[in-house]
Amino acid sequence: MKKMVSLAAKHNEWRQSCVNLIASENVMSPACERLYVSDLMHRYAEGIPHKRYYQGLQYVDQIEDLVQEEFKKHFGADFCDVRPISGTLANYAAFAAISARGDRILSLGVEHGSHVSHEKAGAAGTLGLEVEWLEYNNDCTMNAELSCAKILKIKPKFIVIGGSVILFPQPIQELRKACDEVGAKIIYDAAHVLGLIAAGIFQDPLREGADIITTSTHKTFPGPQGGMILGNIDEETQKKIQAAVFPQFSSNHHLHRMPALYGALREMQTFGKDYATQIVKNAQALARELHNLGFNVLAGDRGFTQSHQVLVNCGQPGFGGEFAGLLERANIILNKNIIPGDGVNPKNPRGIRIGTQEMTRFGMKEDEMNQIAKFIKRVVLDKESPESVAKEVGAFRADFQTVRYCFSD
């Protein structure tokens, strides 16, 4: 027990001295953390509210009802299921509910940002779906005209857009017209940009024509780790999704998430516009400074990004992982990532992916992004000792330890 206590303490101490730029992570506020730790973490609630397979859930039903109704109201949806315990399981449930083995679907492809669950190696392949890809331009934007032509040709059961890399809003309205002609549904995987959508500064998928939003709840949306499905869909499809969530792909759905998820939505309703706006400003500032310092930042002709993400081409196959490893030694945490031109093999990507949402949560703004870019340059381009830079990174991070854009204690 002592060793485990020590390891956990060391992790906490180290991460408080790091600049975390992982695009798929965030931190909850102290208020939401308090909601997260409760007796609910010990309980089971198979089924949907008021139709359970266990007793003792009178308050759980009220909590889950409240969470789902608030998310439906905020996102303008007529359906919400907060039970998926991850974004991947949300995708499994949504895909299974509206397709059958052998159906064809269109995704972005991993080169252009789709999550592995959209692909043959993940949920789509496991469900027996035939996956083909939408078309992209060289500037990291979707080619709507060619993609619509492919929809008309392939006649997919559904298309899935959004995903792991999403620098710019996607052309939902244009795709909707083609999907309507062939009877295809649109699933928008908002895992990375849910907070930006909630704040009204990215795009509004349901208003623009998506049928279903699948998502996780812990990236730009700073809630507990978990998943969710939202949509404007018919009652039969709603029931199919609910049946896919349970019993097909999960049992209990980690009840202690629910109060914290509600708290995070309330925080976004109060502070989200300022928070999300600063996230994007920070991403653009970091991208510009990296570009000015000599890095090959993608999508420069389009202003680099309109989300929390920045993509950098590190030059050669495998350099993404090499640079990420060097930066980790300097207490700068980010990840290697496939970029356009890498193909589908994730082992030796040329790119790195950067996200600004967590450091923004701790109060960093454009000046701090410029300083982070300089740290990255010193390690990657100037070949300074990562361990030496790590000391300066720790001192820099020491001034940013308080979670912002949240209710005070």
Locations of regions flagged by a protein language model:
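N-terminal "arm"/small-domain region of PLP-dependent enzymes with the aminotransferase-like
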Residues: 1-51
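Short acidic (Asp/Glu) and glycine-rich catalytic loops that position anionic groups and cofactors
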Residues: 11-17, 42-49, 238-243, 258-267, ...
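Short, conserved charged micro-motifs
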Residues: 236, 317-324, 362-367
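Conserved PLP-enzyme active-site core in the AAT-like
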Residues: 66-296, 314, 356, 364
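Flexible, glycine/charged-enriched surface loops at secondary-structure junctions
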Residues: 18, 49-50, 79, 252-256, ...
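Conserved small-domain helix->loop->beta segment predominantly found in fold-type I
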Residues: 265-266, 276, 280-325, 334-348, ...
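Glycine-enriched alpha-helix->loop->beta-strand junction motifs that scaffold or abut catalytic
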Residues: 209-211, 331-332, 352
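PLP-dependent enzyme catalytic core of the Aspartate aminotransferase-like
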Residues: 281, 346-409
